[in-house]
Amino acid sequence: MNIMITKIFFLVQLFYIVVSKSSAEENCETVASEVHVTKEEYDEMGRLLRSCSGEVSVNKCEGMCNSQVHPSISSPTGFQKECFCCREKFLRERLVTLTHCYDPDGIRFEDEENALMEVRLREPDECECYKCGDFSR
């Protein structure tokens, strides 16, 4: 009898935790961040022609998503988990310019043709909460 009361009390506490956690506000959003990008250019023989780098402002997904744990008689652990992660909903492609370009000897290019390099990258345009591990979307 005492064990049964303890189990019921535990499940009530667990239910309270699940309900209070799942009612929290989701705040998955697109946030600007700085990353260091390096791109190398090679000729047909595989020799390095130039190496360019720069700090680039890009979007990333950041925030919290509601996740839940439910008691379950069918699960071996006794609980069913539903986890959600903040991930990209849409990606957009854009060009960025790298402004620090060097020859294979490490000497910085001064001529306009070699001093800059355009690089195409993809970044999140919009973020959303998705079931963790679900890559089918």
Swiss-Prot record:
One of its GO terms (biological process) is G protein-coupled receptor signaling pathway. One of its GO terms (molecular function) is G protein-coupled receptor binding. InterPro entries: Bursicon_suB, Cystine-knot_cytokine. Its main location: secreted. The keyword Signal applies. Keywords: Disulfide bond, Hormone, Secreted, Signal. It comes from the Eukaryota. Disulfide bonds join 28-86, 52-101, 61-127, 65-129, 83-132. GO terms for cellular component: bursicon neuropeptide hormone complex. Residues 28-123 form the CTCK domain. Residues 1-24 form the signal peptide. It is found in: Secreted. PANTHER family: PARTNER OF BURSICON (PTHR41151:SF1). Final heterodimeric neurohormone released at the end of the molting cycle, involved in the sclerotization (tanning) of the insect cuticle, melanization and wing spreading. Heterodimer of burs and pburs. This is Partner of bursicon. It comes from Bombyx mori (Silk moth). The gene is pburs.
